[in-house]
């Protein structure tokens, strides 16, 4: 095997590799010999399977493993020539060229190493911003939202017709072709009018009804309705309205304050207002950071700091962006790209600049996190993945395993580090100083 290594810049090197067919064949045979001692095959006793039988059945898998082993050996040889260690590598070696002829393999690999980055003066790049203000009106609106969560429907005493936003207590029975259908009947059912819980047209048909009124409401089941025997069918619901209910919002008394401020010894309207003010401010700040500040800061960092980028990582990121973009391409565009290598390469190259920015920012974020001592431990990582699973109704353990299989855990961890980092950077200085002062007092 021939291996020639060449350093391209501070973080990239190439490894020209030539693997003779005889070496591949020899490695395949070695693997087959090892496998013959443990593989189970009908007609042969354990440990007595002939090498020829193993080769015949598993030649493809053995060849793949052999080539993988030889390339690992080639990479190690290249690292020795470059006077580098394997722990200095970032990402997998990237195949820039791979040819197979008469059993011989000729390949060009890109080996990439982590860049050394100095972020002197990065603080000057942090965008200036005003800590969001919170008005009394916003606090009152947030209080109303909280109280509405504890609201319960109560029957109205005044005489009026049913309107959107009311809760209706009623009986109903549905008919298709003058025949009642299973699951289409209920008594004293309570429904929020306008919630769109029922099929289209039903709730609109109830608007304007009076207490005690009976009415036939004509509707059509959606074509994609879950029950196939009803999908797309016209139906009539016989409805009798018993009660109109309105949400009764509870008073903000001592009992309610204890519910809204669990664990708070001195639960009061003032304490609640202060907590809501802080919550609203943080929500506004979170939006400001994500919509504006984060992008401005990232652009400034990318423009300010220049360093060699690991080519292999950039190529992998370019491939990933290209694959992701395929979902947005038209069928015609996809066919054109498949038919022309030149067009495919041209399209792929259009993602290169964005890929370079993404990779550059990732390394900058990583270095910034170290400077500011931002870390994400395994427990935080698992909690974030479990939370995501619960949010989308998925099995958390399976969701975690999928991330592991895809090798995506480092990307998730990096996203969490980035979130923590920007929260640390953009936390209001007043809040930081208040916390520092409080800690100093406690220490005393």
UniProtKB/Swiss-Prot annotation:
NCBIfam families: tig
Reactions listed under catalytic activity: [protein]-peptidylproline (omega=180) = [protein]-peptidylproline (omega=0)
Signal peptide: none
Domain PPIase FKBP-type: start-end pairs: 165-250
Record flagged with keyword Zinc: no
Gene Ontology process terms (BP): cell division; protein folding; protein transport
Family: Belongs to the FKBP-type PPIase family. Tig subfamily.
First-tier enzyme category under EC: isomerase
Localization terms from the record: Cytoplasm
EC nos: 5.2.1.8
GO molecular function: peptidyl-prolyl cis-trans isomerase activity
Record's GO cellular component terms: cytoplasm
Pfam family, one: Trigger_C
Alphabetical keyword list: Cell cycle, Cell division, Chaperone, Cytoplasm, Isomerase, Rotamase
InterPro entries xref list: PPIase_dom_sf, PPIase_FKBP_dom, Trig_fac, Trigger_fac_C, Trigger_fac_C_sf, Trigger_fac_ribosome-bd_bac, Trigger_fac_ribosome-bd_sf, Trigger_fact/SurA_dom_sf
HAMAP family in the cross-refs: Trigger_factor_Tig
This protein's name: Trigger factor
Function: Involved in protein export. Acts as a chaperone by maintaining the newly synthesized protein in an open conformation. Functions as a peptidyl-prolyl cis-trans isomerase.
């Amino acid at each position: 095997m021939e291996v020639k290594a060449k350093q391209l810049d501070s973080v990239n090197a190439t490894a020209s590799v030539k693997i003779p067919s005889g070496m591949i064949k020899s490695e395949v045979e070695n693997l087959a010999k090892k496998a013959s001692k443990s593989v189970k095959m009908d007609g042969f006793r354990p440990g007595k399977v002939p090498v020829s039988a193993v080769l015949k059945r598993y030649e493809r898998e053995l060849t793949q493993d052999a080539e993988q082993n030889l390339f690992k050996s080639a990479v190690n040889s290249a690292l020795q020539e470059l006077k580098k260690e394997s722990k200095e590598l970032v990402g997998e070696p990237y195949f820039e060229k791979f040819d197979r002829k008469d059993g011989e393999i000729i390949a060009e690999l890109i080996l990439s190493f982590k860049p050394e980055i100095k972020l002197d003066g990065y603080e000057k790049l942090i965008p200036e911003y005003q800590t969001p203000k919170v008005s009394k009106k916003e606090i009152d609106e947030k209080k109303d939202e909280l109280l509405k969560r504890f609201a319960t429907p109560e029957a109205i005493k005044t005489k009026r017709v049913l309107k959107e936003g009311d809760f209706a207590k009623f009986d109903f029975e549905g008919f298709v072709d003058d025949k009642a259908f299973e699951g289409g009947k209920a008594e004293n059912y309570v429904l929020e009018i306008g919630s769109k819980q029922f099929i289209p047209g039903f709730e609109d048909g109830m608007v304007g009804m009076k207490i005690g009124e009976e009415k036939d409401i004509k509707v059509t089941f959606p074509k994609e309705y879950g029950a196939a025997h009803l999908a797309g069918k016209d139906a009539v619901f016989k409805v009798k309205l018993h009660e109109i209910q309105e949400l009764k919002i509870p008073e903000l008394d001592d009992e309610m304050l204890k519910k809204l401020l669990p664990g708070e010894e001195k639960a009061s309207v003032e304490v609640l207002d202060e907590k809501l003010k802080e919550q609203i401010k943080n929500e506004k700040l979170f939006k400001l950071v994500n919509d504006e500040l984060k992008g401005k800061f990232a652009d400034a960092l990318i423009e300010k700091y220049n360093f060699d980028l690991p080519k292999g990582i950039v190529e992998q990121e370019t491939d990933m962006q290209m694959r992701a973009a395929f979902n947005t391409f038209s069928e015609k565009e996809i066919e054109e790209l498949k038919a022309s290598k030149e067009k495919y390469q041209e399209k792929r190259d259009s993602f290169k600049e964005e890929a370079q920015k993404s990779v550059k920012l990732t390394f900058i974020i990583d270095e910034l996190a170290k400077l500011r001592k931002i870390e994400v431990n395994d427990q935080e990582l698992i909690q974030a993945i479990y939370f995501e699973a619960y949010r989308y109704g998925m099995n958390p353990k399976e969701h975690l395993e999928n991330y592991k299989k895809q090798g995506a855990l480092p990307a998730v961890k990096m996203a969490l580090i980035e979130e923590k980092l920007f929260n640390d950077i953009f936390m209001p200085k007043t809040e930081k100083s208040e916390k520092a002062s409080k800690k100093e007092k406690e220490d005393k």
